[in-house]
Structure formats: structure tokens, C-alpha cells
Regions:
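Subtilisin-like serine protease catalytic core
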Residues: 9-24, 29-310, 324
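Short acidic/polar active-site loop segments enriched in Thr and Asp
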Residues: 327
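Short coil-to-helix leader/linker segments, especially the first N-terminal amphipathic alpha-helix
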Residues: 1-10
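Aromatic/hydrophobic pocket-lining residues that form the small-molecule binding cavity
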Residues: 314
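Substrate-binding/specificity loop regions of serine endopeptidase catalytic domains
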Residues: 310, 333-350
Length: 350
């Protein structure tokens, strides 16, 4: 590895005995513990046997080489994990999912009608709007759905205003609407944004006929399309099977006995490659020399190929590593969002 001076370190240590083999806890996607280049360096839990019993009484059955925190009792493993933003959106969906912003005013569609919304917990609502919304495709898809209702309301308002201005005009044009309904300089609403959207649609369809554009913006099919888009987004990003496969409460750090001992996951190639950089036999022709040929790899699975690890899994994996003598703990990449309470679990574990 460039910059690490590993070869020089081995020269310096030549002739010296290793007092204890360091344990490197690799927290990530899993590894192939039977890989010929790694199996001599796989950590073994000396207090555990592969006999279907929890021999060391730590709550994890047959954790001989580590543990999988995204696995189920039946041997299944979650195929992917959601991003933290999606998990947080689903946590707040019933409170804020149907809230949209119009300038300085927020509206809620919780009752099926547009009503002014005032949050009971301003700090929580600001966290949702400023942090969760930006990191959630689901939140944005749902907001778009409700914004279609807002744009329809504005379109009806524009129609009313332009017809009041030109009561006797037979054919109203989009240009008429833009002229009459343009927002003032002090207007903080999304009136101008809706008008701009109307212009874009009119230009795309190469028409200046207000009646045809009006029908597009108030059509019921727009609302149906918005719901279908949200449903497609949810199907892709909104359910990673945690409840069905793992079955724990991911928001309860005390609900800690879950998972399985499956370390060879569908995404284990990533971890196997990383492990091969860290440990293994040196001097083998055709292979790169690893950093530490005497180290052992403890495998802790918290992540699949897609998404971001659950912070509860991360915290428990760190605690597992410490409790079982890890000298070094390697974490996966940072999450995009750290909810305050769950962040505290991580801090306490570290």
C-alpha cells in the first residue's frame, strides 16, 4: 500500500516474535471466510461452537467468526438497506409527509383539503424540512404529489383573475395570464414558480391557448400520476424487508438479540477485497502482499451493496468488536444523515 511503508516495517520487525495476533473488526458487507488467501487469518470466537447453541451466552448463536446484523433467524439476509433519509421520512411521514410550503406559509393535506399548517414541535419540523427532506426521494416524491394540488389551486385562481380583467374576451391566451397574474416584487409565494411552469408547458406544446393549458393543470389525471410516481419510488426505495427478515425494532437499542451468522453475503466480494488488503499470507506469487500477515479478521455485517447502515446495527457491531477484543475497528462510509438519538448510540459505543 503506497505511503504505508509496510515492507520497511517488516524489515524492522524481522526476527521478532509476535506477542499477540491483532484482531481487526471489519464492519461492512461480509466476507468469504473460506477464501484460500484469508482462511488462515479469520478470527475465531474461542468461547463459541457451531452447534446451534449460544455457548458464550452473548445472545448470538454460533457467532464463531462474527455476526450478521441484517440477517434473519431463518438464514435470510436483507438484499439492500434503505438510506437514512428514507427511514427518517417514513418515521415522520404521518406528521409531515403531506405538508407543502408556499412562500412563508405551510399547508397540510392531512384531511384531504388544503389547510394552513402550524407544527406543534418547531425544532422537529425544521429537522424534517432542512435535513430529512433533502435526503429522501420518498419525501420529494410525496411533496411533488401534493404540489400538484397546490398548482391546480393557483391555476384556478389565475383563471379567475384573468377573466375578471378581460370579462368579454372570447379567447384568453397564456400571455394574458402571465401579464395579469405576475407576482409583485414583495410576493413570497410560489405564484411566480407556477406561472413559470405554465409557460414551460405552453412552450413545449407550442400553444398559447389558455383553455387547453388550464385543463392540463387541473386534470384529475395529474393527481393520479403523482400518486403513482410516489408508489413507484416507494417500491424501489421504501422497503428493505427489515421487519420481515430481521424482525427487530430498529429504533430500540435495547432490542439487541437479532441477526444470524451468515457472513458470506451476496455483497461479500467488497469485504473480501478489503480483508485481502489487510491480512493474508505474504510472498505468494501472483498476489499483492497484505499489510498484516499475523492479524485476524472479525467480520460484522451491517450493510448490503446499496443504502446506508442502520445506526443501531453499527453501534451494536462496535460494541461486539470491543467486547470480543478487537484491536482495530474499520467502519463503512459515513451515512448522509445522523438522527440525534441514534447518533448518541454511536457515540456511546465508540
Amino acid at each position: 500500500m503506497y505511503g504505508a511503508c509496510v515492507n520497511e516495517a517488516y524489515e524492522f520487525l524481522k526476527g521478532k516474535k509476535v506477542k499477540a495476533r491483532p484482531i481487526v473488526a471489519l464492519i461492512g458487507t461480509g466476507i468469504d471466510t473460506e477464501h484460500e488467501g484469508l482462511k488462515a487469518n479469520i478470527w475465531k470466537n474461542k468461547k463459541e461452537k457451531a452447534d446451534g447453541k449460544d455457548n458464550d451466552k452473548n445472545g448470538y448463536v454460533d457467532d464463531v467468526n462474527g455476526w450478521n446484523f441484517i440477517g434473519g433467524k431463518d438464514g435470510q439476509v436483507m438484499p439492500f438497506v434503505m438510506r437514512e433519509g428514507e427511514r427518517e421520512f417514513l418515521r415522520f411521514k404521518d406528521k409531515y409527509g403531506d405538508v407543502v410550503r408556499d412562500g412563508d406559509i405551510y399547508y397540510s393535506f392531512a384531511t384531504g383539503k388544503k389547510e394552513i399548517f402550524t407544527p406543534e414541535n418547531a425544532e422537529e419540523f425544521n429537522y424534517y424540512r432542512q435535513c430529512v427532506y433533502k435526503e429522501s426521494r420518498l419525501a420529494q416524491a410525496m411533496s411533488t404529489k401534493w404540489m400538484d394540488h397546490v398548482s391546480a389551486d393557483y391555476t384556478r385562481l389565475f383563471d379567475k383573475e384573468v377573466r375578471a380583467k378581460y370579462p368579454n374576451k372570447e379567447k384568453i391566451t397564456v400571455a394574458d395570464v402571465i401579464e395579469v397574474c405576475a407576482p409583485s416584487k414583495d410576493d413570497t409565494s410560489i405564484r411566480g414558480m407556477i406561472l413559470y411552469g405554465i409557460q414551460i408547458v405552453a412552450n413545449t406544446r407550442r400553444t398559447d391557448d389558455w383553455e387547453s393549458i388550464y385543463k392540463i393543470f387541473v386534470a384529475e389525471s395529474r393527481f393520479t400520476d403523482g400518486q403513482q410516481k410516489y408508489d413507484r419510488t416507494y417500491a424501489k426505495y421504501g422497503n428493505d424487508g427489515r421487519q420481515a427478515i430481521v424482525g427487530d425494532n430498529y429504533l430500540d437499542i435495547n432490542d439487541r438479540v437479532y441477526g444470524n451468522n451468515v457472513l458470506l453475503t451476496a455483497d461479500a466480494a467488497i469485504g473480501t477485497m478489503i480483508a485481502g488488503v489487510i491480512v493474508g499470507q505474504r510472498g505468494v506469487e501472483g498476489r499483492n502482499n497484505p499489510i498484516a500477515d499475523q492479524a485476524e479478521i472479525m467480520t460484522l455485517v451491517v450493510q448490503a451493496g446499496e443504502g446506508e447502515p442502520y445506526l443501531k446495527d453499527m453501534a451494536l457491531a462496535i460494541r461486539y468488536a470491543v467486547d470480543h477484543g478487537a484491536s482495530v475497528i474499520m467502519l463503512p462510509q459515513q451515512n448522509s444523515l445522523y438522527p440525534e438519538e441514534q447518533k448518541q448510540w454511536m457515540s456511546e459505543a465508540i
